[in-house]
């Protein structure tokens, strides 16, 4: 794209008209040197040309439609109304933004900018009490409750709404739902603290004292349990001998959770992150087929828990729902793990890959020209994942603005523009999901400036960057002439179209068409 992106007049979801501001899309446009010369050298015209060529090659297709009643030589209007490609976002702040107006603006993004919503199923806040999953809305999930909270982030279910009302909203607006995550080893964000008391005998709890120095929770900010030197020294066989039932008990509990959630929603959830962030355990050889325990990076996990999670999910999931694996791991071990699981018979439909620039300094470094998330690095990772033969979902995307001032917004917008274009151009890419949509609405410890919107739901420049790409640059709208026998040919982005023409009787007709 060789023109300056101006946000004047680009209004969406009742956001109103923004002040006239812009951000550069090339070094030639960057008169104020928002980005360094070194940055533009990395994202040079040759790279941009390759991206454009790959978008044309991988994201578009040729359409042929026969309109029997169309008069040859007359005009036919071709208008794309939706994408096959997934442009998603997490919906974690549903009804939690403090005012009806902010909540309404947030919800309306789903179906206008975003065509898929990631809905949270983190175990600890979803099942705070054993046997009492939070499917349905209770008072503390309502907009009225959240509007009264002075410090909403201190609530235990912040960013973890009950899923029923979220999914109902998505269904009413034609937005598919992605469930995240079913299985994850994280103690801080996933495993409930009640597990230890619920499934362990007194003897097992006493034995665990040798190996667990401190259990992770929301207060100590540990992602995994703090293990003792004895745990690190012990062999897997020694641990299994001392705790022979621990792994099977954990697996049984995980299987119960998967079965309950997946059966409850059936076809209403179109895809699931079956396992989240397990590649590190695979990379260090901790998951051993046939074993009862895994010496996980998080602490004790069931042996071979990734394979077991896919096996359990496959036994209960709808045939229409996709089963994803998801990870931040950037090394070759992630693709190797997927191929190993496939070889052993695991059904995996999509490879999820995360990209979080959580530290605002990272974006300053990128603007300065440091080699962080460069085209070469991204192509290498995507090519590695392509070897699995799976579609790729950029499942969690964080791009921070170094500040809330104009320059900080411009840096975020430029980085988002170039990264989205590159990701969109990758051969096996099927979707990109932005993580925190609103500033200051992430999880504790995450940056407060990673949104597309300020806290009051006023748009940042990064919003306009994405809105222009998704709803303008990457949507096909053209006019062609009807050929003989009403044949209509066009080339466009894959998705659903409305095709409008005047029939032989002089009446306007509209047909729908899916370009695959």
Question: What residue spans do the PLM features occupy?
Answer:
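Hydrophobic h-region of N-terminal signal peptides that target proteins for export
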Residues: 10-18
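Beta-strand-rich domain onsets/edges
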Residues: 21-96, 116, 128-129, 135-136, ...
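Aromatic-rich peripheral "rim/lid" segments of glycoside hydrolase catalytic domains that contact
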Residues: 28-41, 197-218, 222, 228-236, ...
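Conserved, mostly hydrophobic/aromatic
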Residues: 65, 117, 170, 261, ...
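Active-site beta-loop-alpha junctions enriched in small/polar residues
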Residues: 90-94, 122, 182-184, 274-277, ...
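Short Pro-Gly-centered beta-turn/loop motif in secreted/extracellular proteins
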Residues: 99-113, 489-498
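Aromatic-lined substrate-binding rim segments of carbohydrate-active enzymes
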Residues: 111-114, 120-237, 241, 252-254, ...
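Glycoside hydrolase catalytic-domain groove-lining segments
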Residues: 136, 143, 157-176, 287-404, ...
